[in-house]
């Protein structure tokens, strides 16, 4: 099915811009780490598109762990899903015991999706990407820290990527790119309700 490939190609402007900015600010066109949230995967596909074949770049995809990946209330498709069909293409899908698509759960509407793009499934299957699950509380905590220290209100989707940072280890010289997509002002009620 062409839809996932079309989305990835159109969103590739993200990684094209990353290449330009990294060359300008770092003197090279690639980071050591790329970190992106992943639901259906448009933001993540665009973030990694130009770097899939560059083995110097470590790719980290962050799923919505909801109330915990073992709680039955998450959208952690790569952690808990299995191969299936959704929207006309084969990929990893959250399914019940009979193979029916299962309702996902995430505090973030943008990550509340029962499937994953085929590119992301391939990156996970081949080990090209590391997969991290971040639960609702971790995402909100990370978002509130960004607000406190930098004055940036991230969207709930990107807050999951931020929530992965304490779970990863970097060297001081590493160039780390984490994509913040969306606008957090639309999520302000969720953030205020978490206090």
Language-model features: where?
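Active-site/ligand-binding loops adjacent to catalytic centers
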Residues: 1-6, 12-14, 25-28, 53-56, ...
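Phosphate/ATP-binding catalytic cores across multiple sugar-kinase/actin-like superfamilies
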Residues: 13-25, 161, 167
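A short, small-residue-rich loop immediately preceding and capping a beta-strand
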Residues: 30-43, 59-62, 175-180
């Amino acid at each position: 099915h062409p839809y996932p490939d079309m989305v990835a190609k159109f969103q590739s402007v993200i990684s094209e811009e990353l290449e330009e900015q990294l060359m300008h600010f770092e003197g090279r066109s690639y980071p050591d780490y790329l970190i992106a949230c992943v639901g259906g995967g448009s933001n993540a596909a665009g973030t990694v598109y130009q770097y899939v074949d560059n083995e110097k770049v470590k790719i980290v995809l962050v799923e919505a762990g909801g109330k915990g990946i073992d709680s039955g209330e998450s959208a952690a498709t790569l952690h808990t899903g299995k191969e299936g069909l959704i929207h006309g293409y084969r990929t990893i899908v959250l399914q019940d015991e009979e193979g029916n698509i299962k309702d996902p759960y995430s505090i973030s509407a943008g990550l509340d999706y029962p499937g994953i793009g085929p590119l992301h499934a391939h990156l996970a299957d081949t080990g090209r990407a590391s997969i991290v699950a971040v639960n609702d509380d971790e995402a909100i905590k990370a978002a509130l820290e960004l607000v406190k220290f930098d004055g940036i209100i991230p969207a709930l989707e990107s807050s999951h990527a931020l929530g992965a940072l304490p779970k990863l280890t970097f060297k001081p010289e590493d160039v780390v790119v984490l994509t913040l997509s969306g606008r957090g002002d639309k999520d302000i009620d969720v953030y205020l309700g978490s206090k």
